[in-house]
From Swiss-Prot:
This is tRNA N6-adenosine threonylcarbamoyltransferase. The keyword Ion transport does not apply. Fe cation binds at H112, H116, D304. It is an enzyme of class 2 (transferase). Binds 1 Fe(2+) ion per subunit. It is found in: Cytoplasm. Its main location: cytoplasm. Its EC number is 2.3.1.234. The gene is tsaD. Signal peptide: none annotated. The keyword Glycoprotein does not apply.
Length: 336
């Protein structure tokens, strides 16, 4: 069973073809709009939608040409329906529904977060057994789930204000750095010369619940930098180091608590922030010390991509899900 996946929830246009029977990704194409939005310091929704319109058909032609496949080989077309930028989602959903109508192929709506949650399965070496705890950590979401079976997701905790990735992005703006924030902070943190110069708070780290808060950490960065008389690049690197350490410390601590609370031994990490080297290192240490299994997506599939949508669509399709009509139903916000 072969699925075409379409991702267009924000500023990445992604198409991929996944073979469920072989558990193999056949093809993957991605167009990133980062350069387009970089000069604005963030994603401009109208521009994102227009770029999706311009690129989707081109990527589709490319992916079929390179694989030698045709629409006759496709059993289902999966597309991101929620959450995301409504205009961008509309473009992808309309493209998918149109292809489905023309070629008489079933379509299926996919939740963007479910795509992220399953993305570690794109690693051929990943054999993830249920149940497990999952941390979805990105620019828009920071959530902990207990996953008992496919489609059975119990929310354990989430950010009560800024998502972790959002805090990274806002920190770069506060410090007059570039976009996207996660990469900029991590790169500059690696250049820190005085790693103990700044001590920042770990919001909610010691709370017994599994919720997160990153707004206070962001404010602490602002106040610290405002009071700093020597705003040199060296001190900016030191502050990035302190911020990254604080944010990652909270994430790892909450993951450990979630595993203890649910008595699970398997942890899945996904979303854009899962590419962070320090997060991966600290979680690997946690796994080693407590004999947990940690699963990450391949680095190229941490951020938004069509492969995870094709994968999630395949799992939904074999579990009996598919669109019942041609109605376009996308949502900016939607819990998993």
């Amino acid at each position: 069973m072969i699925v075409l996946g379409i991702e267009s929830s924000c500023d990445e246009t992604g198409l991929a073809i996944y073979d469920y029977s072989k558990k193999k990704l056949i093809a993957d194409e991605l167009y990133s709009q980062v350069k387009l939005h970089k000069k604005y310091g963030g994603v401009v929704p109208e521009l994102a939608s227009r770029e999706h319109i311009a690129k989707l058909n081109l990527l589709a032609k490319k992916i079929f040409k390179e694989t030698g496949l045709s629409f006759e080989d496709i059993d289902c077309i999966a597309y991101t329906a929620m959450p995301g930028l409504v205009g961008a989602l509309m473009v992808g959903a309309t493209f998918a529904k149109t292809l489905g109508l023309i070629h008489n192929i079933d379509t299926i709506a996919v939740h963007h977060l479910e795509g992220h949650l399953l993305s570690p399965l794109l690693d051929h070496n990943s054999n993830i057994e249920y149940p497990f705890v999952a941390l979805l950590v990105s620019g828009g979401h920071t959530q902990l789930f207990e996953v008992k079976e496919f489609g059975e997701y119990s929310l354990l905790g989430e950010s009560i204000d800024d998502a972790a990735g959002e805090a990274f992005d806002k920190t770069t703006k506060l410090l007059g750095m570039g976009y996207p924030g996660g990469v900029e902070v991590a790169n500059l943190a690696d250049q820190a010369t005085d790693k103990s110069k700044y001590i920042l708070p770990r919001p909610m780290k010691n709370k017994p619940n599994l919720d997160f808060s990153f707004s206070g950490l962001k404010t602490a960065v602002l106040n610290t930098w405002y009071d700093e008389q020597d705003q040199s690049l060296e001190n900016k690197a030191n502050l990035c180091y302190a911020f990254q350490n604080a944010a990652i410390d909270v994430l790892v601590s909450k993951c450990a608590k979630a595993l203890q609370k649910t008595k699970n031994t398997r942890l899945v990490i996904s979303g854009g922030v899962s590419a962070n080297k320090l997060l991966r290192h600290q979680l690997d240490l946690l796994a080693k010390n407590r004999e947990y299994q940690i699963f990450f997506p391949p680095m190229k599939y941490c951020t938004d991509n069509g492969a995870m949508i094709a994968l999630a669509g395949a799992y939904r399709y074999v579990n009996g899900f598919k669109d019942s009509n041609l109605e376009i139903n996308v949502k900016a916000r939607s819990p998993l």
